[in-house]
Amino acid sequence: MNKDNLIKNYAVALFNNAVVDNIQDKIFEEITAINRIITDNFDIREFLFSPIVNKNDKVNAVNSLAKNIKMSTIVQNFLLLLVKNSRTAILSNIVDTYNALLYESKNIKIVRVISANKLQPKEQEWIKSRIEKELNQKTEILFDIDSTIIGGIVIKYDSMLQDYSIKGSLEKITKTLKKVRIAA
């Protein structure tokens, strides 16, 4: 099974368990917080991701963490499953996929907007309203910065890419000019 399918299977399983108790948002908050703890703490990350560390030691660590932060049973069992199957390294990907499932269940589209510089709140709101009007759907906008696009914005959602950047325009012009033969 390829990695993307594996990630999706784990995320769907966690999401379906959360749906049973109608606690999808709570589980997302919890799994995101735990992922942040693991990501931000080098020692914890190395311990949980290491193939050398005994699985029983990892199980004990997850159980101890669960007790200390009052982790829900669903999330605790999920993390134990990842540990037992040596899949803790894909937790961040699972969290991202779970987030996508959560927004999809609420009919909210995740849209990534890339700009060359940090956008002001008014600009972000204007872009969000335009995108929601175009898609006729609520959105969750993730704003990223990539100075290589020079100026403008790039909008990505699903498999769509709308490039309104200076870099994109220059690449289109370059491509067109390469096709044109100069008459002598």
Curated annotation (Swiss-Prot):
Presence of the UniProt keyword Secreted in the record: no
UniProt-listed InterPro entries: ATP_synth_OSCP/delta_N_sf, ATPase_OSCP/dsu
MF terms (GO), sorted A to Z: proton-transporting ATP synthase activity, rotational mechanism
Membrane topology, as annotated: Peripheral membrane protein
One Gene Ontology term, aspect cellular component: proton-transporting ATP synthase complex
Pfam families registered for this protein in UniProt: OSCP
Keywords associated with the record: ATP synthesis, Cell inner membrane, Cell membrane, CF(1), Hydrogen ion transport, Ion transport, Membrane, Transport
Cellular compartment(s): Cell inner membrane
Primary residence: membrane
Similarity annotation: Belongs to the ATPase delta chain family.
NCBIfam families per record: ATP_synt_delta (TIGR01145)
Oligomeric and partner information: F-type ATPases have 2 components, F(1) - the catalytic core - and F(0) - the membrane proton channel. F(1) has five subunits: alpha(3), beta(3), gamma(1), delta(1), epsilon(1). F(0) has three main subunits: a(1), b(2) and c(10-14). The alpha and beta chains form an alternating ring which encloses part of the gamma chain. F(1) is attached to F(0) by a central stalk formed by the gamma and epsilon chains, while a peripheral stalk is formed by the delta and b chains.
Function text: F(1)F(0) ATP synthase produces ATP from ADP in the presence of a proton or sodium gradient. F-type ATPases consist of two structural domains, F(1) containing the extramembraneous catalytic core and F(0) containing the membrane proton channel, linked together by a central stalk and a peripheral stalk. During catalysis, ATP synthesis in the catalytic domain of F(1) is coupled via a rotary mechanism of the central stalk subunits to proton translocation. This protein is part of the stalk that links CF(0) to CF(1). It either transmits conformational changes from CF(0) to CF(1) or is implicated in proton conduction.
Protein name: ATP synthase subunit delta
Organism: Rickettsia akari (strain Hartford)
